[in-house]
Swiss-Prot record:
UniProt pathway annotation: Phospholipid metabolism; phosphatidylethanolamine biosynthesis; phosphatidylethanolamine from CDP-diacylglycerol: step 1/2
Membrane topology field: Multi-pass membrane protein
Protein name: CDP-diacylglycerol--serine O-phosphatidyltransferase 3
Pfam families membership: PSS
Record bears the keyword Transferase: yes
UniProt keyword list: Endoplasmic reticulum, Lipid biosynthesis, Lipid metabolism, Membrane, Phospholipid biosynthesis, Phospholipid metabolism, Transferase, Transmembrane, Transmembrane helix
Main location (coarse class): endoplasmic reticulum
Protein's organism: Oryza sativa subsp. japonica (Rice)
Family to which the UniProt record says this protein belongs: Belongs to the CDP-alcohol phosphatidyltransferase class-I family.
Residues passing through the membrane, by range: 103-123, 142-162, 168-188, 260-280, 287-307, 359-379, 384-404
Entry EC no(s): 2.7.8.8
Taxonomic path: Eukaryota, Viridiplantae, Streptophyta, Embryophyta, Tracheophyta
């Protein structure tokens, strides 16, 4: 459906539609002052935001409304709308949510200081007094991390992502630094000490895991089993890694948004499993488990679902107007929920075969991706972390959040250098 916008008579310097009905590009950044001056007196001067983007005008109907067509990216509005201010300048955000984008350093400082005083227990020393010296140390370490994350949320460098809020991605940046510091600390510990240290993060850790090999019996049909002759297939299908494969590749497809690159990573990781099966028992899989179940079923379904999600939202037409301009309560609710979705769903163009340098750059991305995935299994094996431990899920979610701005910025960097 086309987007309908009210049309006002253009100024003498504005571009006119061609007589043959062709497309004419007009620049809103240049047409903003003239369009504001020529608004009818019955309409308020500040009733609509000024969007800094280019419009493609196809036709003007009899009612005086512009019919806009074009790609979904041209239709998409950014969250940072340019609103006229009463002082003659411009404001970058919707008036209802502008306070969220203003600095609140002093307010957070005062609130954080009060929270730290309350959490430290200095107001009630008789309650917090304990002979156990480990508990205060744990609370102190968590308080240090909280203070650092609060600082990163306020002062860390912003990414190119604006949804749901730039502060969210600054917080993710701080969590990535905390994770890096924790890995650095474990690097300087002995292996047994590092395993026992994990008990401070989860009480169920620090215990040696039983070795499990998926390739000990690769028969698809087991005739000597009276209860279930397809017991090997059943145990593999109901393993937790099946769901992990599907959800993981769906998330990777939403991040990378390039089918060729996703299939390279899918096949490449299976080759990595084949390479390191002598080191990790979990990598010792049967041929039908690795080729059929992993690549052709789980990975394919995750990639298909992720790319279908990207195509679905990329093909829809949006009008990202501010929250205050939504006409109904449901519209305001939907606009608030859309704030937690990406601002752009267009597919990334990597062009790995454009030139040798671009091929090396994309190859480095694949190597980094597979290294992060291999680290998951090596850390579980070295630190005795079972697959169903919540720390594994927390780490994967953290890495997914870290990879979202990292891949987007890396793709933007490659596109800017090529242009």
């Amino acid at each position: 459906m086309p987007v309908r916008r009210r049309w006002y008579p253009p100024s003498s310097t504005a571009a006119q539609p061609s007589p043959d009905g062709g497309d004419v590009n007009t620049d809103d950044a240049d047409a903003c002052p003239s369009s504001r001056q020529q608004r009818p007196p019955s309409l308020p001067q500040h009733s609509a935001p000024i969007h800094h983007r280019r419009r493609v005008i196809n036709s003007i109907d009899a009612s005086g409304e512009v019919m806009e067509y074009g790609s979904s990216n041209d239709q998409r509005m950014q969250d940072m709308e340019i609103w006229p201010s009463d002082g003659g300048g411009v404001e970058e955000y919707d008036p209802w949510t502008a306070w969220l984008y203003k600095p609140h350093t002093v307010s957070v400082l005062l609130a954080g200081a009060c929270l730290l005083i309350w959490a430290s227990g200095v107001l009630h020393p008789e309650i917090t007094s304990s002979h156990d010296k480990v508990i205060p140390i744990k609370r102190g370490v968590w308080a240090m991390i909280a203070v650092f994350l609060a600082y990163c949320t306020l002062q860390a460098p912003s990414t190119i992502l604006i949804r749901p809020h730039p502060a969210v991605w600054r917080l993710v940046h701080g969590m990535a630094v905390v994770y890096l510091v924790a890995l650095t600390f474990l690097l300087f510990q002995k292996r047994d000490d590092a395993r026992q240290f994990m008990k401070h993060l989860h009480p169920g850790l620090g215990v040696e895991l039983p070795e499990r090999s998926y390739g000990s019996d690769c028969r698809m049909y087991v005739p000597e089993n009276p209860t279930n002759r397809f017991i090997n297939i059943q145990e593999t299908l109901f393993d937790e890694f099946v769901i992990a494969h599907v959800l993981g590749w769906w998330g990777k497809a939403v991040m990378i948004r390039n089918q060729l690159l996703l299939w390279v990573l899918s096949v490449g990781f299976e080759l990595m499993e084949l390479t390191f099966r002598h080191m990790l028992p979990n990598f010792n899989e049967c041929w039908w488990d690795s080729i059929i179940l992993d690549i052709m079923i789980c990975n394919w379904f995750g990639i298909w679902a992720g790319m279908h999600t990207v195509r679905y939202f990329d093909g829809k037409t949006y009008e990202w107007v501010g929250l205050s301009r939504q006409p109904s309560i449901m519209g305001k609710v939907k606009r608030s929920l859309c704030q937690f979705t990406p601002a752009k769903w267009d597919k990334d163009q990597w062009h790995p075969f454009m030139e040798p340098r671009r091929f090396i750059q994309v190859f480095c991305l694949c190597v980094g991706f597979m290294t992060v995935e291999l680290n998951t299994f090596f850390l579980k094996f070295c630190l005795w972390i079972p697959p169903r431990n919540p720390l594994v899920v927390y780490r994967l979610i953290l890495w997914w959040l870290i990879a979202i701005p990292a891949i987007r910025e890396y793709n933007t960097y490659l596109q800017d250098r090529s242009s």
